[in-house]
């Protein structure tokens, strides 16, 4: 699984709404089409060239820069080199992957809760409101929001946003991205309002998106999990493959 993930999702990822791909000899980066951000998602560096490549990425970044570091990325002291270049680490996440055929689907929704795909701009706005409340304002980059809006008019959709509702109140939100030409779909978001945590809402939201990926013919489902969600996902059948740390740098 890890070899397939590295090749399909990191070395040669597919572009999506609002996201461009730039493949070079030592790095692969994703770039926001509005130029406001870039991210190094794959690298193959050595002790001899790492500092030079890192410095070049920092220098070329017009907007915010993220270096998506995985625990198996060489050289072994790459975290120290990123820190020396002025980048700062975010909390460590766990790369989890599930074979969709092994998941127990469908996942039962909690009583009084329904999960639905977003079909209009109002739904996208609601998704953003939930994320802002759960993760803090500005947690979802504007280019990502625009990508979800753009996907509404595409067939098949490269991104599906999903909301969990309790009556007329949106209580959780997430999205699933379909990486056509690969074996992978990926999960993002998944934030649930504090008063609804521990009731199975997160599992239902994962299950809904897993069914969408299954119905589109994808083999694997991938997510970068925080400590709170990791045990839930592992209980559903996801397997840890690596640790990953976003290293961030913003221009002055």
Give residue spans per PLM region.
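N-terminal charged segments
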Residues: 1-60, 74-75
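Conserved beta-hairpin
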Residues: 20-24, 74-88, 158-174
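Conserved acetyl-CoA binding element of GNAT-fold acetyltransferases
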Residues: 34-45, 70, 183-194
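Acyl-donor-binding surface of acyltransferase catalytic domains
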Residues: 47-122, 223, 245-249
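Conserved acetyl-CoA-binding loop-helix of GNAT-fold acetyltransferases
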Residues: 49-58, 189-194, 198-211, 215, ...
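Helix-loop element at the rim of GNAT/NAT acetyltransferase active sites that forms part
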Residues: 62-64, 130-142
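Conserved active-site alpha-helix within GNAT-family acetyltransferase domains
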Residues: 74-89, 203, 215, 227-244
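A conserved beta-strand-loop-helix scaffold within acyl/acetyltransferase catalytic domains
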Residues: 139-195
